Structure formats: structure tokens, C-alpha cells
A protein has these predicted regions:
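Alpha-helical transmembrane segments of multi-pass membrane proteins predominantly involved
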Residues: 1-184
Length: 184
């Protein structure tokens, strides 16, 4: 069995890699200097780059559906849903900028959570294997705990985060149990 992997085989996942790289850049920007406008702009630029790449690939006519490592299938429907996820994330990051601006401390981490959740959602729609599906689902849902409880000064926000954590943990356990019944 051949386990070598070249960069050309990973090319269909470049939009997801752009979003993941943007989250790393945002983390570094926060570590170096906290600037809410710079972090928000970097997030929007990264999401736009990924959306433009998907739109270009979809409309150039040179795209061939690709199976990446047997775990992800990138076809026109996958790219359409990834594009819709990016548009929704762009709307969320743009609209949340003014809302988060009113908070005094730790405004920038919301964008890291958003980018990680978007990367998980983009991988989720491309997954073609249960292991990739579950890992992508968790990558998408775990940052949502933090986003729900982000304004922890409000009791409803913290309560929502804890309730979602319990509900999601139960759902993940049931999902794993179902996968074990199918494959075991």
C-alpha cells in the first residue's frame, strides 16, 4: 500500500487550508499586538481569498472531482456548500465587528473561534469517511462552545455554552455508538 502524499493531491483542499492558515495568522497577530480592526480585517481577507478561489475553480471549467486520501471528496456540490459556508462566515464576521467593538477585553479571540469552526464546516461537507466526518464535526462544534459563552459576563451566554456542551457531548457519544454498530 502506497502512503506517499504529494501537494498536488491536497490541492482540492486549498480553500480549507487558507482558512486554517488565516486562523494561525490571526493567533500570531493577537500574540504580537492586540488590534481588533487588524484581526477583523485579516479574517475577512482570508475568508474572501478562500471564497474567490472556490468561485474561480467552479467557474473556470477546469475542475475535476477529486478524492483526497480516501477521506474527502471535493466535487461541485462540495464547492457550492463550502462557498455558502464562507459567505455566511463573512456575514458573521462583518456583522459581529461592530457588536464586539463594544466589549472592553478579549475581543479578538472570537475570530479565531469563527475561523476554526468554518474550517471544520468546510471539511464536514467534503468528508466521505466516518472518521473524517466525526473529526470535522468536532472541529466545527467545539469552537461554537466558546462562541456561545463568549460574552461570559451575561449569565444567559454562559448557560447557553454549558447547555450546548452537554447536548453536543451526548450527541457525539450517540453518533460514535451508531458508527461502532455499523462498523463493529
Amino acid at each position: 500500500m502506497n502512503f506517499t502524499l504529494s501537494f498536488s493531491e491536497l490541492m482540492p483542499l486549498v480553500p480549507v487550508m487558507i482558512v486554517a492558515l488565516t486562523s494561525v495568522v490571526v493567533m500570531l497577530l493577537i500574540a504580537i499586538k492586540r488590534n481588533h480592526n487588524l484581526v477583523a480585517t485579516t479574517t475577512v481577507v482570508g475568508l474572501n481569498l478562500s471564497a474567490i478561489l472556490i468561485a474561480y475553480t467552479m467557474f473556470s471549467g477546469h475542475f475535476v472531482p477529486a478524492n483526497v486520501m480516501g477521506m474527502f471528496m471535493v466535487d461541485p456540490f462540495t464547492m457550492l456548500y463550502q462557498f455558502l459556508i464562507l459567505i455566511a462566515a463573512l456575514a458573521c464576521s462583518t456583522l459581529s465587528h461592530a457588536y464586539i467593538e463594544t466589549y472592553k477585553d478579549n475581543r479578538e479571540e472570537l475570530y479565531i473561534l469563527l475561523l476554526c469552526s468554518v474550517a471544520g464546516a468546510m471539511l464536514l461537507v467534503a468528508s466521505s469517511h466516518y472518521a473524517a466526518f466525526f473529526i470535522s464535526l468536532e472541529l466545527m462544534s467545539i469552537p461554537v462552545y466558546g462562541m456561545l459563552a463568549y460574552t461570559h459576563q451575561r449569565s444567559q451566554s454562559l448557560e447557553a455554552g454549558i447547555k450546548y456542551l452537554v447536548l453536543s457531548a451526548t450527541a457525539s457519544a450517540m453518533l460514535l455508538l451508531g458508527m461502532a454498530y455499523i462498523y463493529a
